[in-house]
């Protein structure tokens, strides 16, 4: 059930609560997608976490930021800290997926007093001016993993959308267009999207994902160019787990490995045969990795 919490300045945030364990904040990807697509993550971890799935500002019933620049990872992290304070939650676990994983890392660096543990799933944080080797590895990984789907029936329609994502999104006039675009490219996010069980889970994820076009436009309009977490990663003091799929075309080993190297004492769980959404592709493997880390 969706709930609303009041924030300073007449603003509000919408959220759901799933589970009965330690308090945790779950951060969705995008930026701009509602947190409901992470209900599966929360249910998998319901025995160890009481998860607060918070809609990002501007999504669901959460108030948009006054400045579109606040759709950055730091802007999201500061919004989530306001929500934590408004909910009177103590020190929390933060768990984020994709852009939400990048936000979770940012949150842990900026708010160490609020963060018990950090779990970043399929996160990115190595910017476009990264070490040439890391950048080259990421570009090669991206192209190779897209091309491996070339024989799938959806590929010919989806590949042009992926290749012109920024231009199409900036030209979109409503959130429904962004959601339709996302539905077309979502199969790329799985290592084996044509398996019936994976396809069914992906279809359900697409059904519940609601987009905030303003966040998408701000991101594709240039915010992403400033994302490089390396100056922050060394400041993360809490126990941290980096989870990545070895076949993730966006945030695979070329992102996960340098991120993990940059965080003192962090752990890296590289899930074989997985793409960008391990909670859908290998739910039990994902649950064991995260629950094992949190229960250590």
Label the model's feature ranges.
Residues 236, 242-244:
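Short beta-strand/loop motif that positions the catalytic acidic residue
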Residues 265-296:
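Catalytic active-site module of serine/aspartate enzymes centered on a nucleophile-bearing elbow/loop
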Residues 56-99, 110, 288:
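Active-site loop/oxyanion-hole signature of alpha/beta-hydrolase fold enzymes
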Residues 249-255:
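Conserved alpha/beta-hydrolase "acid-adjacent" motif
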Residues 7-64, 69, 250:
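Conserved HGGG/HGGXW glycine-rich cap/lid loop of the alpha/beta-hydrolase fold
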């Amino acid at each position: 059930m969706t709930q609303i919490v009041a924030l300073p300045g007449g603003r509000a945030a919408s959220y759901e609560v799933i589970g009965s364990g330690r308090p945790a904040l779950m951060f969705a990807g995008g930026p701009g997608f509602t947190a409901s697509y992470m209900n599966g993550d929360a249910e998998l971890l319901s025995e160890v976490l009481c998860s607060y799935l918070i809609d990002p500002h501007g999504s669901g019933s959460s108030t948009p930021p006054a400045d579109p620049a606040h759709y950055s990872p730091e802007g999201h992290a500061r919004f989530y800290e306001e929500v934590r304070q408004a909910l009177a939650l103590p020190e929390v676990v933060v768990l984020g997926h994709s852009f939400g994983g990048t936000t979770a890392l940012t949150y842990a660096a900026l708010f160490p007093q609020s963060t018990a543990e950090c779990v970043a799933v399929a996160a990115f944080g190595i910017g476009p001016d990264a070490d040439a080797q890391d950048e080259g590895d990421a570009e090669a990984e991206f192209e190779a993993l897209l091309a491996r789907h070339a024989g799938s029936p959806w590929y010919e329609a989806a590949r042009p959308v992926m290749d012109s994502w920024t231009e199409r999104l900036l030209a979109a006039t409503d959130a429904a267009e962004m959601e339709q675009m996302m539905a077309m490219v979502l199969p790329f996010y799985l290592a084996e999207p044509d398996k019936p069980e994976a396809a069914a889970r992906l279809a359900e994820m697409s059904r519940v994902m609601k987009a905030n076009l303003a966040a998408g436009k701000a991101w594709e309009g240039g915010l992403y160019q400033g994302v490089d977490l390396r100056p922050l990663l060394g400041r993360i003091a809490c126990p941290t787990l980096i989870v990545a799929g070895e076949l993730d075309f966006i945030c695979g080993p070329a992102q996960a490995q340098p991120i993990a190297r940059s965080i003192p004492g962090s752990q890296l769980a590289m899930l074989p045969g997985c793409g960008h959404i391990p909670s859908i592709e290998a739910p039990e493997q994902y649950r064991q990795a995260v629950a094992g880390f949190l229960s250590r």
